[in-house]
Amino acid sequence: MRVGVALACTECKRRNYMTNKNKKNDPDRIELKKYCKWCKTQTVHKETK
């Protein structure tokens, strides 16, 4: 079952990306290194509600 999730920057707390994940394969919250246009650098983005 795939679910839509938002990814928020850990530096500025802005929600920059929407993605989906498979809850069966990734039951925990995902963390990805993505570009934040407000921080102007690559930062870790964590899954939010």
UniProtKB/Swiss-Prot annotation:
Keyword Ribonucleoprotein: yes
UniProt-recorded Gene Ontology molecular function terms: structural constituent of ribosome
Disulfide bonds, paired cysteine numbers: none
GO biological process, one term: translation
InterPro entries linked to this entry: Ribosomal_bL33, Ribosomal_bL33_CS, Ribosomal_bL33_sf, Ribosomal_zn-bd
UniProt KW keywords: Ribonucleoprotein, Ribosomal protein
GO CC entries: cytoplasm; ribonucleoprotein complex; ribosome
SUPFAM superfamilies: Zn-binding ribosomal proteins (SSF57829)
Family membership noted in the UniProt record: Belongs to the bacterial ribosomal protein bL33 family.
Protein name listed in UniProt: Large ribosomal subunit protein bL33
Gene: rpmG
